[in-house]
Amino acid sequence: MQRASTQDVYDGSGDDLNKLDSLKSVLNDVLSSLERFQVDLDVATSDIYKVSERSNKIQVNLNNLKAVESALGAEIDGAILPPDLIKTISTGDMDHPSWNSALEKLTSFLEGGEDDSSLGNMFNSLQINKDQKKLVDKLRDKAIERIRNYIVVTIKMFRQAFVDVFPIRKHRLIANKNYYLFLFKFNRKLALELQRAYINTMNWFYLYHFEQYSRFLDKVHVLKGETIRVEEDRKGLFNLSKGAQQSYGNQMLSVNLRPQDFDMNSVLTASTMHHIESSPQYIERVYCSWELVLTEHVSSEYAFLLEYFNLSKDQQATVFAAIFEKTLHFSRKYITGLISSSIDCIGILKSIRFTQKLALQAQTNIVPVIEPHYNSMILFLWPRFQAVMDMHCESLRKTNLSVKPEEITSRPHPLSQRVAELLYSLSMLSVNVVEAEPVARSASRLAQDYVSMLQNLCKTVNDKRRQSRFLSNNYTLISTVLSGVSGNLAIEQKTYFEKLNENLTNFQ
């Protein structure tokens, strides 16, 4: 029994060893498989890495190809004229915005042909670009031809009678100013010829229309004015009725009874002709109407020249003189005739103040080309104002008023009221004046001649007290009137008459 059991044990151990050997064999097979798999995996990994590198290279090449295609595509597109562009430039409506846009595209084509980049040089060598360049040049010449005709037609419009130049210039020239710039860039000689044609046309235009305007203003009844002395037989202006001449005579020396401000709404025009024919006008309204119309045209023309022709500072003065020289000469001639026949010192001084205001506005609005005209007008008006004031003074010196002693009363003389009105008006028109002007000297001479006249008038009375009372009342009237206005001139004249009055009081 015991031997049998031991034999069984040995038999069992043998089986286990066999199984272990089998497992080892299997394990060895597995290890061999794993080793082969690792080798295969390393090979596969190496292949994948190679594929990835190749893929990256392909992607880089693809991107480079796309970049080249994009660049070449742009060059090709830039070298080929679109059919609609050719049609628009050749036959399109030049007043339509599309023509302006087409001209900008054509300019891009023309400027693109001058590209000196390496890619541009490479492409310019292509036969297709050479052919397109010929077509672009032909289209450029067509555009130049049409622009020339367009501008010529516009300039001819300005030579039509009663034409309103402002809307034509705004809608046909300013709105399409790129047309002239294109012409100036690609055919400067023709552009300068058209500029000269415009200058010659506007030279004629302004001279013609201001000659017409002067004929219209010649129909206006202008109040010429009168001297300050009292005359029983003072003649009316333009054969006015007695009531009318008295009314205007009383207003000639009073600035407050005249229109105060002048602007484009107060300009004398054909539409106001009915009112003008029935109502005489003060000289300053005619003068200011003329200067306002002239200033309006000059300012508009100056702005147009700068915007459309893009002139330099030296060219501005030259072109402006070429356009307005004859007109300004005619203007000075007309104003000389208008003012030289007037003895309305208030109207002339108002014209001076208005011109000074225009000169200041010209500096503010940066229109320097018109300043010499204003300066020449002021230099002409001042001597005329002084001459008229001399007439007033001479009138007072030559006034031969004879009064009876009983007529020397405490009431101021009627002439004192007129002198007071004149001094008041001169002071009102000189409120803001700080520099020495001919007005102050003329006013002083007038006051002195007036005082001399009053003193001579009193010599017919032996009663010194009555003389002093009469003179004092006249001096008081004038100083009281001058109290209503400020400024150096008013203060100077008021002080003068107050001192005269004070001396009379001390004498009494």
Curated annotation (Swiss-Prot):
What keywords does the record list, in alphabetical order?
A: Golgi apparatus, Membrane, Protein transport, Transport
According to the lineage, what is the superkingdom? Eukaryota
> Would I find Protein transport among this entry's keywords?
yes
Q: Where is the signal peptide?
A: none
> Where does the UniProt annotation locate this protein?
Golgi apparatus, trans-Golgi network membrane
One Pfam family from the record: Vps52_C
User: Principal place where this protein is found?
Assistant: Golgi
Write down what this protein is called: Vacuolar protein sorting-associated protein 52
Annotated source species? Schizosaccharomyces pombe (strain 972 / ATCC 24843)
Task: Quote the gene name from the UniProt entry.
Answer: vps52
